[in-house]
Amino acid sequence: MSNIVIVGAQWGDEGKGKIADTLAEKADLVVRYQGGNNAGHTLVVNGKKTFLHLIPSGVLHQHTKCVIGHGVVLDPVALDEEITRLQATGIAISAENLFVSESCTIITSYHKLLDAVRESNTSEKIGTTGKGIGPAYEDKVSRKGIKFKHLFDKDVLRSRLAISLAEKETLFRDLYKVEYPTLEQEFDKLFALGQKLKQYAADTFSIIDQAIAAGKNVVYEGAQGVLLDVDYGTYPFVTSSNTSVAGVYSGATTAGHGLDHVIGITKAYTTRVGEGPFPTELFDDVGKFIQHKGGEIGVTTGRIRRCGWLDLPLLKYSAKCSNLTSIALTKVDVLSDMDTLKVCIGYKYEGREIYCAYPGIDLYKVEPILVEMEPFSINETVTKDNIPAALKTYLKTIENHVGIPISSLAYGPSREQILFFEDYFKKG
């Protein structure tokens, strides 16, 4: 058995879904442990794309059970729509393979409206997806949240809605002056959705615990990336949950269960959606080339992703924050056949050179130390025996600076275009 965590090691959009989908072939459970439908995973199988936002990437494997842990904030409208959309394409989803924690905090219409009006009424944009993620986590922490199980009980749901709406009603009416659903309108919608989705409600804590005790393979699938972690990330330009490995313990299982592998999913370059510092960002034709070739458009937001060279000081920081055991490098093919190829190995900052970022650093004030790398070309299926020499040098540069090995290499969009240097699953 193996307990494997997939963590985004950058600002999200690293290709976690692709790696999770590939590992799910040998997994018994694939578990989402934080975030919400602000995540967007793209899977490509036989040339066909599947887009996921809430449901774990194991859904394409019939034997794999998918779990949404209690650390996820759940939009029941989005979950219902995603299930319906996937079922329409022939993907089997039922109470036999999808288990949603009864303790997930629910995202309501009020959370989404509050998210939108806040972003539109501030001069300092965060770049929120507008999905209501932050306000839902606020209610969770302030003990005003609505849990998934509350949707099934009329009296409890109405009571929890009244608590949640009380403060927001004043904001909507007096501060933002926007229309909002009445309590009864929201109640009717949520209760109806609760009846429809109740079949998926489960004690996921025990499901995961029992699977581990039975020696099953469990893959924990993170959303976003370490650099968006509410504690470790580039605050305030972060998400509202713990996207690092810490989120596994707070959002799915207990610290009593050890983790065999913590894989940091990393693009061969760097991207970011929304606002915030980005030391290696490219504003020239090279950046536009990477953007176009890499198809760098957000699955959830439809926004163009900012692109830049691979940032090793930030990657090393992510590795430390999540105790990464290895790196899964993705989108290597995007850098193939480039005229110019660079990587950031350090920063000049406040009169000194540093080679690993840290929480208090002001990334707006760093000057990246860029080194020129020899361009490489990928024109065929990549095996351990035919990796181009220049690519080997690129990989070794990453390993030497970050201090952990690269355990897999993705060089195309399909699940077949991954070269594994390590078997994550224990034998026997």
UniProtKB/Swiss-Prot annotation:
It catalyses: IMP + L-aspartate + GTP = N(6)-(1,2-dicarboxyethyl)-AMP + GDP + phosphate + 2 H(+). GO terms for cellular component: cytoplasm. Mg(2+) binds at D13, G40. Substrate binds at V299, T300, T301, G302, R303, I304, R305. Pfam families: Adenylsucc_synt. It comes from the Bacteria. Gene3D superfamilies: Adenylosuccinate Synthetase, subunit A, domain 1 (3.40.440.10), Adenylosuccinate Synthetase, subunit A, domain 2 (1.10.300.10), Adenylosuccinate Synthetase, subunit A, domain 3 (3.90.170.10). GTP binds at residues 12-18, 40-42, 305, 331-333, 410-412. It is found in: Cytoplasm. GO terms for molecular function: adenylosuccinate synthase activity; GTP binding; magnesium ion binding. IMP binds at D13, E14, G15, K16, N38, A39, G40, H41, T129, R143, Q224, T239, R303. Binds 1 Mg(2+) ion per subunit. Its cofactor is Mg(2+). This is Adenylosuccinate synthetase. The lineage of its organism: Bacteria, Pseudomonadati, Pseudomonadota, Gammaproteobacteria, Thiotrichales.
